[in-house]
Regions:
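Short, Lys/Arg-enriched N-terminal segment that forms or immediately precedes the first helix
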Residues: 1-5, 89
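S-adenosyl-L-methionine
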Residues: 6, 10, 25
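The short coil/loop that forms the "turn" connecting the two helices of the helix-turn-helix
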Residues: 10-11, 42
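Alpha-helical structural segments
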Residues: 14-21, 25, 39, 49, ...
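Ser/Thr-centered, proline-biased regulatory motifs
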Residues: 28-38
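Key DNA-contact positions within bacterial/archaeal DNA-binding proteins
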Residues: 45
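Helical hydrophobic small-molecule/effector-binding pocket
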Residues: 85-109, 114-122
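Hydrophobic/aromatic-rich alpha-helical bundle segments in the mid-to-C-terminal region
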Residues: 118-129, 135-196
């Protein structure tokens, strides 16, 4: 009996998810198509044949992650009569779930730090603008609500990517005080886990 061949879209997704893990761990410069191929369990030639270059693979992996983030926000089960506080809490809880996926979190952080990169700057800016527009147009936040939500998210990203709690625990707790008691601690624990 012949082995069933995986459809092309599933193979592409397998490689994109592997690329997200590798780029999240080591960044664009240190990642190689070979390391991504090993992570995906395919040959380097297969990755190159599918994506042509590491640059294209990074662009597609970044777009994949941003689209996942935007989809989660756009599909949030927010009632039409929910208060601003209820909406922020629901979206904040959703973002906290996203942050638990360390690879997705680090890919977003790395992408949003590349605004001045000559290759990826436009992708970085477009991706951030896409998230903002989803919050405004799909979620229904006004400009002030979207700014507050994004500022809290970016503070979380910064504190977590700096691992600020390792040397400045009181400061990290103060900065993330808007999360509420115990939630910052839970975030630290997730990022203290092996492989994070």
């Amino acid at each position: 009996m012949a082995a069933t061949r995986m459809p092309a879209n599933e193979r592409k997704l397998l490689m994109l998810e592997a690329a997200v893990r590798v780029f999240a761990r080591v960044g664009y410069a240190a990642a190689t198509t070979d390391s991504i191929a090993r992570e995906a369990g395919v040959s380097q030639a297969y990755v190159v044949r599918f994506f042509r270059s590491k640059e294209t693979l990074f662009e597609e992996a970044a777009t994949y992650v941003v689209e996942q983030l935007c989809r989660r926000f756009a599909e949030a089960p927010i009632a039409a009569d929910s208060t601003d506080a209820e909406r922020r809490k629901l979206l904040g809880d959703m973002y906290a779930e996203i942050v638990k996926d360390h690879d997705m979190f680090m890919m977003i952080v790395r992408l949003f730090m590349m605004g001045s990169d000559p290759r990826f700057g436009q992708l970085s800016r477009d991706s951030f603008a896409r998230v903002y527009r989803v919050l405004r147009e799909d979620v229904g936040m006004d400009a002030q609500q979207a700014r507050l939500f994004l500022s809290h998210g970016l503070l979380m990203n910064l504190v977590l990517s700096l691992r600020l709690w390792e040397g400045e625990r009181d400061l990290a707790d103060e900065i993330l005080g808007f999360l509420g008691k115990g939630r910052a601690e839970a975030m630290y624990s997730l990022h203290d886990a092996p492989g994070s």
